[in-house]
């Protein structure tokens, strides 16, 4: 059964590139509300989650995680009252992650070195940014369930991000969400055609 699920999920992952994050959100994927891309024109990226739980001043654990996050999407829960006053990710981490083949990073907290991240065009999604840095404490937990923006993310969950934000999909739900997204996209295509023919969106949607 696990082998069959792996095959099904693998095929579904190849189809993800055909949808936007809003498509997938409408189809049932869970949004990480408040998480935004550092790159304003961020293209669609996706991958399996490798999760990290750290204190607001510990960037060491994230640096450690990069070493075994190839083809993964790092998702970090940042805990503590200082999570919006201290950055746990920056330009050097982004450079290292890009070279190591990390798909992207989600930080439920702050990042810095925004200009460096943009120059690298490395997919970083975060709540905010600030100049203050934490410390290389390396006291966090890796590959545990984390609470990111109120959503429980587990290792292996599918993370999808673009210029609109980030959503999370459980592997077992991926085929259903893909099918829902196909139907949604087809409905939108038909609506778009009617608008181009001169109809008002209000009338197309039967709004009084």
Curated annotation (Swiss-Prot):
It comes from the Archaea. GO terms for molecular function: 4-hydroxy-4-methyl-2-oxoglutarate aldolase activity; oxaloacetate decarboxylase activity. This is Uncharacterized protein MJ0644. It comes from Methanocaldococcus jannaschii (strain ATCC 43067 / DSM 2661 / JAL-1 / JCM 10045 / NBRC 100440) (Methanococcus jannaschii).
């Amino acid at each position: 059964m696990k082998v069959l699920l792996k095959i099904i999920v693998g095929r579904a992952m190849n189809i993800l590139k055909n949808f936007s994050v809003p498509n997938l959100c409408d189809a049932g994927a869970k949004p990480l509300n408040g998480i935004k891309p550092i790159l304003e024109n961020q293209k669609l990226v996706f991958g399996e989650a490798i999760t990290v739980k750290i204190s607001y001043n510990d960037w060491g654990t994230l640096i450690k995680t990069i070493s075994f996050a190839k083809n993964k999407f790092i998702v970090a829960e940042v805990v503590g009252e200082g999570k919006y006053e201290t950055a746990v990710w920056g330009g050097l981490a982004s450079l290292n992650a890009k070279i190591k083949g990390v798909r992207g990073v989600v930080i439920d907290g702050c990042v810095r070195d925004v200009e460096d991240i943009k120059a690298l065009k490395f997919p970083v999604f975060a709540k905010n940014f600030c100049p203050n840095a934490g410390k290389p404490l390396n006291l966090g937990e890796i590959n545990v369930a984390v609470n990111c923006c109120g959503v429980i993310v587990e290792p292996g969950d599918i993370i999808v991000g673009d210029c609109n934000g980030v959503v999370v999909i459980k592997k077992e739900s991926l085929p259903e969400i893909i099918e829902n997204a196909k139907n949604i996209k087809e409905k939108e295509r038909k609506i778009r055609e009617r608008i181009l023919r001169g109809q008002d969106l209000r009338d197309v949607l039967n709004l009084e």
